Amino acid sequence: MLKTSLSLIIVAVLIAAGAADAAVTVTAAPALTAPAAADTAALRQKTLSLSAMVPGGGDHPIRLTGSEPSQYFDFALRRDEAVVNAVLNLTMTASPSLLAETSQVNVYLNGELQTTVQLTKALLGQRANVEVPLDVRRFRAQNQLMLQFVGHYQPVCENPANEVLWLSVAPESALKLTTEKLKVANDLSLFPAPFIDAAGDTTAPAVLPIVFAGTPSRETKEAAALFASLAGKLAGWRGIEIPVYYNALPPERHFVVFRTKDTDPDFLKDRPLPLGPAVTMADAPFSRTAKMLLISGTTGEDLNAAVLALADTKRVLIGETLAAAGTRPVKRAAWDAPKWLTETTPVTLADLAQYPGQLSAKSQSSARVTLPLNLAPDTWFTSPENLTLNLAYRYTRPVNHADAQLRVTVNDVLVDSENVSTAESRGTAKVTLPIASGALSPDASAAPAMKGRNALAMTLAYSRNFSEGSLTNCRSASLLPQQLEVEPGSTVTLSGAYHWAELPNLAMWLSGGFPYTKYADLSETALVAPKTISSGNLSVLLTSVARAAQATGLAGLNLTVVEDWTDNRLTDKDILAAGTLPEGALTDFSTRAAQELSTRLSKAVQAKTWEKTSASFTGNAAVTAAFESPFTSGRTVTMLLTESDEAAQMLSRRLADTSDLSSVSGTLAVITPDAVYSYAAAPTFTSGNLPWYRQVWTGVSGHPLLVSLAALLCALLAGTGVYRFMRRQVRGRS
């Protein structure tokens, strides 16, 4: 019955596809139709979760104590917006043992006290909602919010480390901002702002629409793919979604337009077209504040040249228009993505830092520095010595003969620790990072192991001993802030590792863009975008390219775009394709159906008849299917297939979120708005540079009985050889 119900539910989705109770609330003081979201008001509401602004915070509550009374929250504002109203919504629970009225929470914005919330009896021991208005005049481009807990449990002789001193801030606590859009100058020196602003809302992926006059030509699609890859690199870890519009204005926001002499959107018909490749920043129609980035050219080849010029980091951007032609960069070597550790040279921690000040930390008792540590998804370790950290650091010396300890963790798993000197204020350490021989582990809880994306943390923890004394012999304690400074020249060294993977593997593709990102410039990647591709499916393809660039930190400026499966350029390439699911692709939710779909797709590609077998449906599911390329052995084809435009929009949104789809595995996945179902539906192959003898050992290491039999066979052969040798020796003497 359960299986039948589940099948009915899933088939309905896949047809044609293949509370918080609050006890107290306290308030502390023309020819072209305009887009649907026209600029009737330039105000925007956004909510920033406090937990999301804490490194590693996630959905966990924030706990303030007597020994750790402060928590900092860093956030930024876009250059083209100003705050007109700001309210901090705190959902918190205070210890019932606190003294009412004298205990309090101080709220600071950029170092200036905003308000003090007194913890009255009504607020102790139960959840309470507190609204704190903030002074909008104190907001800057880079901002820091601080909560300071001042708790008391007795009038005199208190111990700051007493366990009754605590305040818990719930994960739903948030900073609610009302911002007004500002009009910025048409100046390319601002680029990538305002189109991609790294100082914007970092809690959600960026969104940058692209507009075409209609279904674009192959050359225009290639230019758009180059730009999407550049956008993914610029958006960084937050990710980016790239919606596509055909001859229509997107809802109120900044956007990009590709235009040529023969393909110009209706809303630009009266605007002169520059001669040759050009990039121009201009005001968007029907908007007081939105901008459009016009990528223009006489032909589609000019559009490619314009994007390449924009991506040239050596070129100075200034003024409204860049009239220049760029060229394709030299092909890069394998596995040399800027964001990945490589064996060519040690990587400094300064290179791993994502923002200024990341190598510095302050705290009352444990200063923590956290850095990303990324590896190529197919990295294969052979020894625990493959990955080492050479660390140099400075710190505040412990006082009164207290102890201090440096702890190094990877993914919150302890790697090493050592006591630091109380006589010095600097130290060094050589740490071997945790490695289990073999492939990277996709399991975040596996230890010791490394994943493709890791969090390297260095924490300096200080011991504190407090004595309350007595009413007649009161002893006071002063909590001095502690500071840890990691030297930028500290290095992480990768050596002696290989590259080896079983492909296709959707988990590798979604986490690191592999195998396409093996060459970070995508020089061995081909995109298949049919001549009649829908705007939704083109959006999926472009967002996928942007996601790959986000994983490598490099724009894939050597990619290739083709329009059909008969193109000879598909040979010796890893292929990424987007399209519509064929009719009847999934009629039953089962492993067998998934395997049949994977086989069907592979045969359709091999027969070069994919476009002839596609159809349009009205469901809301998508399928990602990967299999070995029928054109070149050892290469991968990944197909992104949707049932409808709604499904394409859903898949594009989920691909834009770099933390989403982490549960996908195998070779085929069915993706719905609420769930993901993975299958091992296609044969796999191996790829990499692992020596043959290690391949043999890898193949048999998972079969202990086979290893035992092989050992017995070797012993028997060796014994037989020795026996025969000795027999010959005896016969020779006689």
Describe the role of every protein-language-model region:
Residues 1-5, 703:
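Positively charged n-region of N-terminal signal peptides that target proteins for export
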Residues 5-6, 709:
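Alpha-helical hydrophobic membrane-insertion segments
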